[in-house]
Amino acid sequence: MEYLKLYTLANNQAVIATNNERRFYSYDTCVCVYDYDKQEFTLSENESHFSRTTVKWLNKFLAGYDTTYQSIKKIARRENLN
């Protein structure tokens, strides 16, 4: 079963990845990266319909939140994404 996982990285990035290849954060499992300047998720280079839909949903979901690095971690824990 495929699922999404939100990784909050030490360099103030949040990365959404999938487990579709049974690997955790790596180039080819990365779906999108959170841009703290734009305050939105952007697609990684391996764009697909799945990741476009995911990015739209995530940006809509996070629209009402304070999306600082720490709050992204809290949202992830509360929503069981992390």
Labelled PLM ranges:
Residues 1-82:
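Terminal leader/tail segments of proteins
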